[in-house]
Amino acid sequence: MMNCRVFSPLLVALALVAFATPRARAADLIRPKVIVLATFEVGADTGDKPGEFQYWVEREKLTQSLTVPGLDRPVRFNDQGVYGVVSGTTVRAGAQIMALCLDPRFDLSKTYWLINGIAGVNPHLASEGSAAWARHVIDGDIAYEIDTREAPADWPYGIMALGNKNPKDKPVIPDWAPKPMSWTLNPTLVAWAFALTKNVALLDSPEAQKHRALYRDFPNGSRPPYVLLGDSFASCRYWHGAVMQKWADDWTALYTKGAGTAAMTNMEDHGLANALTRLATMGRVDFQRVLILRTGSNFSMPPTGQSAAASLVAEYQGMIPALEAAHRVGAPVVHALVKDWAKFEAQTPRP
């Protein structure tokens, strides 16, 4: 009894510290309103040849920086609560975002995400320089594959879903196969972002005009760039060609049950969606606050009369229009979220 009475004041003090410390730390947590996520940058963040990040850093005045362990580049931010991060490409993107979101200095539970980058655009749906708000993300990596040249003559391509016998049948996904194969973004939030930006004037260039004139057999591919609703087909391989585009179209229809259209192809969105959904189950982020905006820097398949090989290695004609579109279309959404933060912190926007 004597020992208990002697140590009881110390125990009480320790208990008070233990309860007070989380509250004190909570007051110091970093709470971004919006995180703009680019996947790569060329050289420096400012003042040189631009990648996906540079226009955001320069135009949103992301002049402050913070080093986060596990990230290749510092996080940039401004006083308005807009943060910018470069995730890296391919599977590295998901790993770096996990590192960011698990950093104990951040509270990202109310943060909105704008995944914002260039992509290969499907000429059946849009032209270079166009911007597509994704409703769905499709994983194009997990598959059986043989060289198409070795495939049976009646196969459209040499890729099929795990558990399948051929690519034409609807697959019965085995229990052991990784899941999910697609992610659906918050449809109300996507509709709001699209309604806010659908009439944004996009940059066109003489080079892009000349290039898309080759796509005269594609009405949407030969039109000036515009803002659309179109989904994100992601795989770590940089593929190109009409056969591969058909595969992307078919898999998008398959894994969205006919609701999706493969508008933009990229190498990161499936990894990012996978990471963010897992982080959401941990209470670190809110997946209902995630937006994906992809802009066409190049076509995903050649025009009539050109080989896929020649088209693949041709110089991008839509790079600068795509980088410009990423900011022109994304910025109004970021600004609206920040301006009405008193409302949007508690509830997501509606059209």
Where are these regions (language model features)?
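Sec/Tat signal peptide C-region and signal peptidase I cleavage site
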Residues: T21-A26
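Bacterial N-terminal signal peptides
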Residues: S8-A18
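Accessory terminal and edge-of-domain segments that mediate assembly/interaction
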Residues: A27-P351
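N-terminal secretory signal peptides that target proteins for export/translocation
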Residues: M1-C4
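N-terminal intrinsically disordered, low-complexity tails enriched in polar/charged
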Residues: V6-F7, D28
